[in-house]
């Protein structure tokens, strides 16, 4: 057999395998909450096997939800998913009402995509009487009814504390994904002249992410108590002469990131950037980081977040130094598992 003939056979096999793989993908009907409409459309744009479906989100005069799932008969025997955003207690009840019903509509399988698990930072009971709402939320999600295909799959990105994966009961199948591949892809697009190293603002962030970023040199910061204050200090590593990227799972007020940036700059970092999967930013605290004359002008070269918190993405727009790295492609892939 000639070399050209062998190459043609190999190319034909590769094409055939690709076609078979594409045909084996399941068709998914994706419902979504109002906040997540843009992300849902981006997910559908990633795959021809994802079809968007709609829900009528209305309220009665007393404020309680008046909901209707369109095409309820058409999704029987189909793979169904729901894209949720538990951005506030006010919207959780209406979404849970839909989430509990969809698996009961005789669907082949049901997947809940909850990019941000909102109560994840409230997982500890430091004294008797503390309420660990992370466990409460996990119990609510764990009680989703099974579908004809079995337990519900729950897709969550970068849950705050690693032990929270054990909060979910056996009635659901949690799939814990991460946004770190989006960061590494973006870092590869930076100029080759920049020496990039990764900084973790505390030991918790190091535990969560260091294995995913072990091909980068690292710096670890820590918080130490001085009187009534908690001061950020450099624990290990040398940021001098480098573009340092602070990595964490979420940001609220941003105080820790700002203090960490000051410490890194004081130790000789040429640039400081930040990445968090979940830009929560309550009370518009993201404004502290925008490039303007407020004492923090361009303190951060880049601030990367994902679109796991749609309200934040909408508020920030394209304001520097923020860049949004979309989870759409990753979610589309997760829906095929």
From Swiss-Prot:
GO molecular function: ATP binding; kinase activity; magnesium ion binding; ribose phosphate diphosphokinase activity
Keywords: Acetylation, ATP-binding, Kinase, Magnesium, Metal-binding, Nucleotide biosynthesis, Nucleotide-binding, Transferase
Organism: Arabidopsis thaliana
Catalytic activity: D-ribose 5-phosphate + ATP = 5-phospho-alpha-D-ribose 1-diphosphate + AMP + H(+)
GO CC annotations on file: cytoplasm; cytosol; plasma membrane; plasmodesma
InterPro entries listed in its UniProt record: Pribosyltran_N, PRibTrfase_dom, PRTase-like, Rib-P_diPkinase
EC number: 2.7.6.1
Name of the gene this protein is made from: PRS4
Listed GO biological process terms: nucleotide biosynthetic process
Binding of phosphoribosylpyrophosphate, as annotated region: 241-256
A Pfam family the protein falls into: Pribosyltran_N
Record family assignment: Belongs to the ribose-phosphate pyrophosphokinase family.
Record's keyword annotation contains RNA-binding: no
Protein name, UniProt field: Ribose-phosphate pyrophosphokinase 4
Coiled coil: none
PTM-bearing positions, type N-acetylserine: 2
Annotated binding of Mg(2+), by residue: 158, 160
Keyword Glycoprotein listed: no
């Amino acid at each position: 057999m000639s070399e050209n003939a062998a190459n043609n056979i190999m190319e034909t096999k590769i094409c055939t395998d690709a076609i078979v793989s594409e045909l084996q993908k399941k068709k998914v009907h994706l419902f979504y909450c109002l906040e997540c409409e843009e992300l849902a459309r981006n997910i559908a744009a990633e795959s021809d096997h994802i079809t968007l479906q709609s829900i009528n989100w209305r309220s009665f005069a007393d404020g309680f939800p008046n909901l209707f799932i369109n095409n309820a008969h058409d999704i029987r025997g189909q793979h169904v998913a729901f894209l949720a955003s538990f951005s506030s207690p006010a919207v959780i009840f209406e979404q849970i009402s839909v989430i509990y019903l969809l698996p009961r509509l005789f669907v082949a399988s049901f997947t809940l995509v909850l990019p941000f698990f909102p109560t994840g930072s409230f997982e500890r009971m430091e004294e008797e009487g503390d309420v660990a709402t992370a466990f409460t939320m996990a119990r609510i999600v764990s009680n989703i009814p099974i579908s004809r295909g079995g337990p519900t799959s729950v897709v969550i990105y970068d849950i705050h504390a690693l032990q929270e994966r054990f909060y979910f009961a056996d009635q659901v199948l949690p799939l814990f994904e991460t946004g770190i591949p989006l960061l590494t892809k973006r870092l590869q697009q930076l100029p080759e002249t920049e020496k990039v190293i990764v900084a973790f603002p505390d030991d918790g962030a190091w535990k969560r992410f260091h294995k995913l970023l072990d091909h980068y040199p690292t710096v670890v910061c820590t918080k130490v108590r001085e009187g009534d204050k908690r001061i950020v200090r450099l624990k290990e590593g040398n940021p001098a002469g480098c573009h340092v990227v602070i990595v964490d799972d979420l940001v609220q007020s941003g105080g820790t990131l700002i203090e960490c940036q000051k410490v890194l700059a004081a130790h000789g970092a040429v640039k400081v950037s930040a990445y968090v999967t979940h830009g929560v930013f309550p009370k518009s605290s993201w404004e502290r980081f925008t490039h303007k004359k407020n004492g923090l002008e361009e303190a951060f070269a880049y601030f990367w977040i994902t679109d796991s918190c749609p309200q934040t993405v909408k508020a920030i727009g394209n304001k520097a130094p923020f860049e949004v790295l979309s989870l759409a492609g990753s979610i589309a892939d997760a829906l095929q598992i």
